Amino acid sequence: MEAVRPDSCERGTAAARAEERPAPEARAHFRVTRFIMEAGVKLGMQSIPIATACTIYHKFFCEINLDAYDLYLVAMSSLYLAGKVEEQHLRTRDIINVSHRYFNPGSEPLELDSRFWELRDSIVQCELLMLRVLRFQVSFQHPHKYLLHYLISLKNWLNRYSWQRTPISVTAWALLRDSYHGGLCLRFQAQHLAVAVLYLALQVYGVEVPAEGEAEKPWWQVFSDDLTKPIIDNIVSDLIQIYTMDTEIP
């Protein structure tokens, strides 16, 4: 087991943005986190447990070499562990069956044979390994509660017509969800991520916050005092890179 700390795991890094095309590691993690999200939905997981599963996965590979373990086994164990952390417990059998159908569409559930039990044991053993590698630090502060608060405040600032005619809320939640395809959850503070996805949603629809020009400081700094425009720009840049990968990866 080789411990590493990839540059992409450092807070606010510009390493990934320096490349015109995403690194192979980023593309691999994009595919696997897409699997985590789709499997999580099929398992009936709520948004916070899915976010926790993605964060556990990303954090594990901030400590471990990419080639050391099977990525999808780590993903399945991340789902299993996240269910425990967020008290939405999952059965290993359900995780295995959903994963099997993901890779083999239309197939029947696996028989309870030696192959099944070997995979189940691998998931459990991998979970224990992940807990040790992460030093049992598997509880995270997610941006979701901040985004909810910010959306309520923004709704009160904007006029009713602007709010109703543009899907700002839906877009901001979608941007936040998609941010977990990359390691933004580890590189940036939860409050900063929440403000940045809201900022981008407003930019997408050309919506301006009332009295912005007369205010002493930008609306986004009202939500987070230590947030700066360069941080927002970095988050937006990383989000754009994620959507670029989405168009390139089948």
From Swiss-Prot:
Keywords: Acetylation, Cyclin. One of its GO terms (molecular function) is protein kinase activator activity. The modification N-acetylmethionine is found at residue 1. Transmembrane segments: none annotated. Belongs to the cyclin family. Cyclin-like FAM58 subfamily. Associates with CDK10 to promote its kinase activity. Activating cyclin for the cyclin-associated kinase CDK10. This is Cyclin-Q. It comes from Rattus norvegicus (Rat).
